[in-house]
Amino acid sequence: MKNIRNFSIIAHIDHGKSTIADRFIQFCGGLSDREMSAQVLDSMDIEKERGITIKSQSVTLDYQARNNETYQLNFIDTPGHVDFSYEVSRSLSACEGALLIVDASQGVEAQTIANCYTALDQGLEVVPVLNKIDLPAADPDRVVDEIEDVIGVEAHDAVYASAKSGMGIEDILEQIVEKIPAPKGNIDSPIKALIIDSWFDNYLGVVSLIRVIDGEIRTKTKIKIFSNGKEHLVDEVGVFRPKRKKTNSLKAGEVGFLIASIKNIDGAPVGDTITGAKNSASKPLEGFKPVQPRVFSGIFPISGEDYEKFRDALAKLRLNDAALQYEPENSDALGFGFRIGFLGLLHMEIVQERLEREYNLNLITTAPTVIYEILDTKGVIYRIDSPSKIPINQSIAEFREPIITANILVTDEYVGVIISLCVEKRGVQKNITYMGGQVSLVYELPLNEVVFDFFDRLKSISRGFASMDYRFERYQKSDLIRLDIMINQEPVDVLALIIHRNDSVHKGRELVEKMKKLIPRQMFDVTIQACIGSKIISRSNVKALRKNVTAKCYGGDISRKRKLLDKQKKGKKRMRSVGKVNIPQEVFLAVLHID
């Protein structure tokens, strides 16, 4: 056990984390050169295309150190994006140390800080590494100062490396062996293991990535899952090198996979504890918390016939993604679909893209919303995740919205524009710190202002230099109202929004104008109205397509023409009362992009 090292890598998106992992695998001979592909551990197509890691992965390598001893290195690859921070915290809790990888040209970014603090809070040993040292723009001295000033980790002896060329890889492995402590644990104690991640395999059922804390798990051992008390027989255990390799057992301190014919992913929740069925541990490991979605959106199949297929696709995705929560939703405008909860906007995009790509579905997505609290006059608190769930006739004492604390890191030339953006989004400045050329801004912002287009605008006004990380703070009383959109006097439930009263008139007008351009002309007039309660705040018409019914009247009496026009008018009126307006997908997306 003293020769085991469990470690994780903390890095911002695109700072070279997955490439360093590839070099480790190559250096320790995990795969032959022929089998090596770029970013071995990013197994989903979408991960490779976007160049990001979404699911946690793991690999076990044997490393012959300079002191001639062989060490078992268990490396757990983690996602870098703010939406997947729960996956990061679970992966970190299975390790004794973490490599902090920072791009030597870009310096420290907000996401790195957040994950690094998580690691330090859990008592991990952090080993700094400067990657991309061979870039012409690399400035290692500045970055070392930044790591020490911003994060507070000793970095003067950081390893200089270039994952692309393979420089410094052996030095990093030596640092892991020297600095990261060996795991603690007792092989004779009752079994205790942490589920780091779970995914579904069509043939094997649920495969769980686990870190054994105490005891030893062998095949045919009977185990128990702590949170639901269910018992299972272990079919197979083993390690990833990075291909799956069967072993006889997993001992205390080791990381590997476990298959126990568990039928669905809820049977092995991520972050939960596994123990022996007969000789059980008395209490579970700390830190398990069910994942709470923060952003909700309605997703509907464009064709009603796809509903069953959509439901099955969601159930399959849910097998691999414990953070995904959904419930059926019925909309007058869009028919049957699901209200789905996500960790954040990137998570939402990825889920929608996977549904469309892997399951061949055409979907319409409504504007994302967050969870609000409503206090009624009787003192009862409701939580709602959709504007259509707001009780219209009940008296609301106060409306509360979720507030987040955002930590924004940016170069000093863009501070002005970012402060303006935060003020526009109803932000309250809490702190501002200048560190060399970097500035750290801390703002409290309403989450629903961030959900729409905050990230996109932050990136565009700072030319991509700003990075941001946020955490949920509290619910706070706010003057919010429900804005409804009516098409031909019929409210469209999926277009309703919850917004601040001060923005309502401006946003209502803007939305109506945008929809006027996007709704195609019909055979009858289409009226678009924005209203708050019974008060109409904006209105616009999409003119009808008309046939020239008087074309064949040459000269003659005016009453003949009028008779034809009146007949057309009556027909249009009747058509309008029975006609349905087809709303294209762009209209729902327009709700997302109102400034």
Curated annotation (Swiss-Prot):
Residues holding GTP: D14, H15, G16, K17, S18, T19, N131, K132, I133, D134
Catalyzed reaction equations: GTP + H2O = GDP + phosphate + H(+)
Domain tr-type G intervals: 2-184
Topology of this chain in the membrane: Peripheral membrane protein
Single GO MF annotation: GTP binding
Keyword Cell inner membrane annotated: yes
InterPro entries: EF-4, EFG_III/V, EFG_V-like, EFTu-like_2, G_TR_CS, LepA_C_sf, LepA_CTD, LepA_IV
Name of a matching Pfam family: LepA_C
GO biological process: positive regulation of translation
One of the record's GO cellular component terms: plasma membrane
Keywords per UniProt: Cell inner membrane, Cell membrane, GTP-binding, Hydrolase, Membrane, Nucleotide-binding, Protein biosynthesis
Protein's cellular compartments: Cell inner membrane
Domain of life, source organism: Bacteria
Catalytic EC class: hydrolase
The enzyme's E.C. designation: 3.6.5.n1
Gene3D superfamilies, alphabetized: 3.30.70.240, Elongation factor 4, C-terminal domain, Elongation Factor G (Translational Gtpase), domain 3, P-loop containing nucleotide triphosphate hydrolases, Translation factors
Family per record: Belongs to the TRAFAC class translation factor GTPase superfamily. Classic translation factor GTPase family. LepA subfamily.
NCBIfam families linked: lepA (TIGR01393), small_GTP (TIGR00231)
Its job: Required for accurate and efficient protein synthesis under certain stress conditions. May act as a fidelity factor of the translation reaction, by catalyzing a one-codon backward translocation of tRNAs on improperly translocated ribosomes. Back-translocation proceeds from a post-translocation (POST) complex to a pre-translocation (PRE) complex, thus giving elongation factor G a second chance to translocate the tRNAs correctly. Binds to ribosomes in a GTP-dependent manner.
Protein's name according to its UniProt entry: Elongation factor 4
Gene: lepA
